[in-house]
Amino acid sequence: MNVEEMKKAVAKEALKFIEDEMVVGLGTGSTTAYFINYLGKLLMEGELEDVYGVPTSHQARLLALEAGIPVVSLDEVDAIDIAVDGADEVDPHMNLIKGRGAALTMEKIIEYRAGMFIVLVDESKLVEYLGQKMPVPIEVIPAAWRAIAEELEVFNATAELRMAVKKDGPVVTDNGNFILDAKFARIEDPLDLEIELNTIPGVVENGIFADIADIILVGTPEGVKRMER
């Protein structure tokens, strides 16, 4: 089973948690895209009914509409039953780094409010500690990015402004902000660092998701494995 097959396997496994009349938070990224497509197929075939999606990004919204999933905004629903999203790193305590898709702020808002948060990853995303492979994305007010990058030196972190690939200039989030990718030597206390980073003036949100995931579905060559609290 290659990586894409692992992604498809965990996406299909996540469908087992979806029931009629649910409001589902739809994450951003390649693995979640499979889930959105599969969910849309079940709705089109009548195997699920009255399921609504709350997208975490413009990308997720467009994918949901293409898949035939009715889309609503966060302020149109009283509650989110379940949220499904990917992650860039997962530590043994189910803490996450997210945000390579630059949608981390809405992801955290929606997933924090969900009754259940399910994370979809392949086994390459499992790490011994957060920061082992990936930097922590930090969404920042554009005018403050340089000052915040300097402030992060207090945390022994090196931060780089994320630049766009298919256009000139930096990546701009759906909220109109910039992304700093901050590399930490080792994140010993993810929850503490998550809170501390958000106290820096100009920081909108950061990509540490500590103590928030309920179930993590991990794609492996042997099949889907589950981590849960």
Curated annotation (Swiss-Prot):
Pathway annotation from the record: Carbohydrate degradation; pentose phosphate pathway; D-ribose 5-phosphate from D-ribulose 5-phosphate (non-oxidative stage): step 1/1
EC numbers: 5.3.1.6
Signal peptide feature range: none
BP term (GO), one: D-ribose metabolic process
Keyword Isomerase in annotation: yes
Molecular function GO labels: ribose-5-phosphate isomerase activity
Keywords: Isomerase
Top-level taxon of origin: Archaea
Catalytic residues of the enzyme: E107
CDD domains tied to this protein: RPI_A (cd01398)
Catalysed reactions listed for this entry: aldehydo-D-ribose 5-phosphate = D-ribulose 5-phosphate
GO cellular component, one term: cytosol
Family named by the database record: Belongs to the ribose 5-phosphate isomerase family.
Job description of the protein: Catalyzes the reversible conversion of ribose-5-phosphate to ribulose 5-phosphate.
HAMAP family: Rib_5P_isom_A
Subunit structure comment from the entry: Homodimer.
The name this protein goes by in its record: Ribose-5-phosphate isomerase A
Organism of derivation: Thermococcus kodakarensis (strain ATCC BAA-918 / JCM 12380 / KOD1) (Pyrococcus kodakaraensis (strain KOD1))
